[in-house]
């Protein structure tokens, strides 16, 4: 089982009092599923909350993680004799049509797929379970 987490703190103005609102935004893998979470707390008033869910992160979280940590590129490590295991993994993990999975497989075979480190580690693990070797490379923010 893969354990990967990534987070970032961001500040904004509290809607309740105008104070400084500190939010911890994150993405993680739990029990082989992609998850995201937000914890927020105002430094001046009792306004606080926590929200988490399974699945792809909302764009606000993705963009904050990419801006802070940069991107991770996932590629197939070798030219596959058959893309069937790659297509199966992509269809299962991302609920893609066969055509969409083929486009994603072409991307993985070529320049690679880019996302957060957690997203790419999750996909790499799904491919590994189908005996597909991959490489991950990080690019700084």
Predicted segment positions?
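Short, amphipathic alpha-helical interaction segments embedded in low-complexity terminal/linker regions
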Residues: 10, 18-19, 23-141
